[in-house]
Amino acid sequence: MNQPTSSKNKILTWQALGLMTFSSVWGFGNIVNGYANQGLKAVVSWIIMFTIYFIPYTLMVGEMGSTFKDSQGGVSSWIRSTSSAKLAYFAGWTYWICHMPYLAQKPQSMLVALGWAIFRNGSLTKMMSPLVLQSIALILFFFFLWYASRGIRSLKHIGALAGSTKVIMSFLYILLALAAPYITEAKTFTYRLDMETLMPTFDFDYMTTLAILVFAVGGCERLSPYVNNLKDPSREYPRSMIFMTIMVCVTAILGTFAMGLMFDPQNVPKVPHDEWFLLLLCKTWRILRRRSN
């Protein structure tokens, strides 16, 4: 587990690892879920969550990664070094089991996104029989499994691409919400940045929705096995965690403000979570069509 990595495999930069971690931790759906549950009050919730949980959590992961910079097993290696091999085994096993549903739904999510890109609706998966759909999802899963087995160079390229794309798309949405009234005839909502608008009510219902934000910012330790692929792990791994943390904080807060421009903060639509993306895509598409016309 703790075998030194040869110099030829130390090809990751801290920026690339930060983008890879960002793509595994963050998604725009987290902003949508936060706004759907709390409206603009999610801004304060994000700040609370980042202050008491996410920032300390990422700093601890960065410290562990720099301390055990020669390990190749990530969390399992850390537990093995500080406790026992048996506990490390159980940690690795439970980590894999809890990620099985997450990994299994990823290929199907790609097909849903492809359907929106081609047909501008979510009908692609409904056009297929369950057997065909699951067969395609399985082929996609094995393809990316094969691609990942090619080594760190392949992961570096696809991880950096995924992270960069998420960052760019998040900021494009924020810019679109701000620029929509100026480039089209689309109207956006206005709101006051005061305590009444931003401060949530700290009751039981609020605490239950706060749990959604906790799960939204977990998983920065997933890329810890690649810490020894950095040229200077003790310095660069914490730097990559700080880089990722800043990007998450900025996109979460600015993205929530942008949602408030497109959806009335005083009358947040009460629709199921799986329909929020439909609302978001339809509204964005209408703005873009007005621009093209």
Feature map (PLM): residue ranges:
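Juxtamembrane helix-boundary/capping and inter-helix hinge elements in multi-pass membrane proteins
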Residues: 38-41, 68-73, 81-87, 228-236, ...
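Membrane-interface helix termini and inter-helical loops of multi-pass transporters
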Residues: 33, 114-126, 183-196, 268-270
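Hydrophobic, membrane-embedded alpha-helices of multi-pass small-molecule transporters
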Residues: 12-29, 49, 137-140, 177-180, ...
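Hydrophobic transmembrane alpha-helices that form the core helical bundles
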Residues: 55-67, 71-141, 146-149, 174, ...
